[in-house]
Amino acid sequence: MPVSKKKEEQGKTLIGERSLAMCENGKKCIGVDVGGTSVKLGLFETDGTLRFKWEVPTRKEEGGRYILEDVAASIREVLAEREIHLADILGAGLGIPGPVLPDGYVEVCVNLGWRDLNPQKELSALLDGIPVKSGNDANVAALGEMWRGGGMGFTDIVMVTLGTGVGGGIIIDEKIIAGKHGLGGEIGHIHVRDEEWEHCNCGGVGCVEQIASATGIAREARRRMAAEETPSALRQYGDDVTAKDVLDAAKAGDELALSVVETVGRYLGLTLATIAMTVDPQMFVIGGGVSKAGQFLIDIIDKYYQHYTPISENKGIIGLAKLGNDAGIYGAARLVLG
């Protein structure tokens, strides 16, 4: 399978004490982030330096049967171009957009068409038996942010991704907490309010994803515009209003937009407080497209987070993710190091 894009990039070179003990001189590891449109791959030194990254298309026809074959072929091609042998690869990590059981088994991955598959065993077999580890993509991205991103320097973080939906990942003692059924970190489906009209794709009602995702923010703005007569710059967009429109207007002081963002911040603050009282992370890392609103959004979330956690003076801080779309490949590579 031909490589569609290549890019050289130097990464950060610091590494935690635990990982240092696991490094092997001269060895490299590979991070693979499988998405519905493309598969992102990265070649890393074991100290976290990203040497090379590339992408291949995700071929989902015939139940996604070609995806791992394409990944293996592209890895072999890139290694051959750089005169690196598979024997020099410590292992590969695999981020998958769906629940992954502790043994790497995937019962179903709707986005890829996979059913009853163990992709880490399949990929290992395609790469001459090199070790392969796998995890849910959101959890893996959280691991990446802990290793070389917004959570670098901490061992216990929770990542919350605000995009089309709300995703998340929990890292405690540098390990992913995925749970027995692979559902750990499904932060978007934490119940935060009872609104009968607010049905989530999961089948539940009142999930934080329905409020704090990009689609949820736009929906809330449309609902407010229909229910209220408050003048607002958002009205020019009508039903085409986006989360970015709402956040930009809120930054400019638009009253209706600010009320929407306050609602978003309140329920995200409540969600983070619930998580803090459960796992007590050192840091919450906020990523995804909505997080591009920056410190403006973080400050609103933090206001409510502080309100809902009055019993604790020492609590996890809230900050922004730093790795963007590369978080998945960083985290997948970090899986290899244990």
Q: Residues of each region from the PLM?
A:
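Short beta-strand segments
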Residues: D33, G91-P97, M159-G165, G169-I171
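Short, acidic/small-residue loops that bind anionic groups at enzyme active sites
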Residues: D116-E122, G188, V192
